[in-house]
């Protein structure tokens, strides 16, 4: 039986897992969390009361958190693209950069986006200012790191790049990556040219109108 993924095409952490699945052509059943499948949300809540997604179900076992799901896929459904290196120290670098993209790019980006959704009287301009400064710092560090790299942590795409793609895609919409960070901009372009990433971007296009800050006319 194929694993089942509960996800939404526009959600950044869902992209992360979808990229991993598409990279290795892993067969799965996609339960899209939207009006076209109203039962999916009810099933998700039964599996994970926090109602966070994505959630993967395999042989009746729920696997939760995007990084853990990708680790699980590498164990149960390995493919030609090794998303976690076999060599332990190389794997540590991949896991570190996975956390870097989630914690230091995705998190401040999410603060900027979430602030826009709030009622105007409850918005937090200072928090947004802090988030923008944090993103500039994160871009600067990453620019130096990517100076001599094609992919985040290895010679080919890994878990780290699965995290990087949605992080940098949406972060550039929320707080544009400046021209001074040319290596980050080039890396983002390479990610968007990768077939698995291009696929998730295309699948999300119908939902761009819902981006709280307004989706730019690009990408």
Go through each PLM region and give its residues.
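Acidic/histidine-enriched, glycine/proline-rich intrinsically disordered or flexible terminal extensions
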Residues: 203-219
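Short, charged/polar low-complexity linear motifs in solvent-exposed/disordered segments
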Residues: 46, 82-83, 115, 178, ...
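Positions that flank functional sites
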Residues: 35-36, 157, 206-207
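GST-like domain detector, emphasizing the conserved glutathione-binding G-site
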Residues: 1-129
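Residue-level recognition of oxygen-bearing side chains
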Residues: 68, 89, 183, 196, ...
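Residue-level detector of family-conserved "landmark" positions at structurally sensitive sites
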Residues: 31, 66, 156, 201-202
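GST-like fold's C-terminal all-alpha helical module
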Residues: 101-195, 200
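Compositionally biased, low-structure terminal segments
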Residues: 29, 182, 211-212
């Amino acid at each position: 039986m194929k694993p089942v993924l509960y996800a939404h095409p526009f959600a950044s952490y869902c992209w992360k897992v979808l990229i991993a699945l598409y990279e290795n052509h892993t067969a799965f059943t996609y339960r899209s969390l939207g009006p076209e499948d109203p039962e999916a949300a009810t099933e998700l809540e039964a599996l994970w009361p926090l109602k966070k997604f994505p959630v993967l179900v395999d042989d009746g076992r729920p696997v939760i958190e995007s990084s853990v799901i990708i680790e699980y896929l590498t164990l149960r459904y390995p493919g030609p693209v090794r998303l976690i290196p076999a060599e332990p120290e190389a794997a540590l670098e991949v896991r570190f950069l996975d956390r870097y993209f989630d914690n230091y790019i995705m998190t401040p980006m999410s603060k900027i986006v979430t602030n826009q959704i709030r009622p105007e009287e409850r918005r937090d301009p200072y928090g947004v200012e802090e988030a923008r400064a944090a993103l500039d710092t994160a871009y600067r560090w990453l620019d130096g790191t990517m100076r001599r790299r094609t992919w985040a942590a290895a010679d080919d795409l890994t878990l780290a790049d699965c995290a990087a793609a949605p992080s940098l895609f949406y972060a550039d919409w929320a707080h544009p990556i400046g021209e001074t960070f040319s290596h980050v901009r080039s890396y983002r372009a390479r990610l968007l040219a990768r077939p698995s990433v291009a696929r998730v971007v295309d699948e999300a296009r119908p939902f761009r109108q819902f981006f709280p800050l307004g989706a730019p006319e690009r990408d």
